[in-house]
């Protein structure tokens, strides 16, 4: 889990546009965030296995 101070800092509008970055909406993780779902890879995997993300299923070939 991310610190509350870092989550609050990220929500503020930055002075420059390039300072914006993605953060997982569920746990606050700043790295490996899937933009389409706004989730980090770990949270995405957990929710996908539970079937809570519509249209996502485990690949098999």
From Swiss-Prot:
Entry's cofactor comment: Binds 1 zinc ion per subunit.
Keyword Cytoplasm belongs to the record: no
Disulfide bond sites: none
Keyword Zinc on entry: yes
GO terms classed as biological process: translation
GO molecular function, one term: structural constituent of ribosome
Transmembrane parts of this sequence: none
Reported cofactor(s): Zn(2+)
Full protein name: Small ribosomal subunit protein uS14B
Job description of the protein: Binds 16S rRNA, required for the assembly of 30S particles and may also be responsible for determining the conformation of the 16S rRNA at the A site.
Known partners and oligomeric status: Part of the 30S ribosomal subunit. Contacts proteins S3 and S10.
Recorded family membership: Belongs to the universal ribosomal protein uS14 family. Zinc-binding uS14 subfamily.
GO cellular component, one term: small ribosomal subunit
Gene for this chain: rpsZ1
Keyword tags: Metal-binding, Ribonucleoprotein, Ribosomal protein, RNA-binding, rRNA-binding, Zinc
Signal peptide extent: none
NCBIfam families membership: PRK08061.1
Entry binding sites for Zn(2+): 24, 27, 40, 43
């Amino acid at each position: 889990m991310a610190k509350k101070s870092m989550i609050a800092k990220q929500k503020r509008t930055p002075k420059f546009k390039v300072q914006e970055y993605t953060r997982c909406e569920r746990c606050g993780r700043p790295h490996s965030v899937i933009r389409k779902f706004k989730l980090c890879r770990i949270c995405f995997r957990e929710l996908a296995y539970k079937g809570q993300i519509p249209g996502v299923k485990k690949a098999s070939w």
